Amino acid sequence: MRCCLKAFRDSVTRSVKIYGLYISIYIIHSQILRNSCHAPEYGKNGILVMGDVAVTPVPDPNQLAQIAVCTAQTAKAVAGIENPKVAMLSFSTKGSAKHEVVDKVVEATKIAKEMAPTLDLDGEMQADAALVPEVGASKAPGSPVAGEANVLIVPSLEVGNISYKLVQRLGHADAIGPILQGIARPVNDLSRGCSIEDVYRKIGRAHV
């Protein structure tokens, strides 16, 4: 099922009514693949996976942890990232700032590590610490993810949606998504602002 003629919320609501949810996943989330040809040094040859950018406005720690683990699985299955390195993003790196929203990311990181103990996942960390090796080494020494992240987990939908659209438009990145997870059948959605190229890329990913 593919949707792009109405608001994303309507597409998700109808998809859930028609197909239902996987029993093991109590929340739907989505992520976007960004093939950034202008910045191949980031992610895996310029490919980054981000979640959640379209569904859950303010995830709690448990929801954020599940988003992280499932997004890593999608990075491996769909984006060809054999070794996902998941960064739990915040405006703080390893306790550099104190706030309740930072605490949420810290708690989500702990839960995600318990859910997937073999997954390379770390946080909380700022985006530059996650992506730039020199910054990561300075701000989060010893982290298995800092400076090498290819999966970015944002703390809220507001952050994710704004971030990916800025990167897409200002950074000239190819946005492929959102890729929905948690629905019992494959469902894909496209922004009403998408281009013909976006449609072609999404069709290709839908058949992976």
Give residue ranges: language-model regions:
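Anion-binding alpha/beta catalytic cores of soluble intermediary-metabolism enzymes, centered on
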Residues: M1-A146, N150-H207
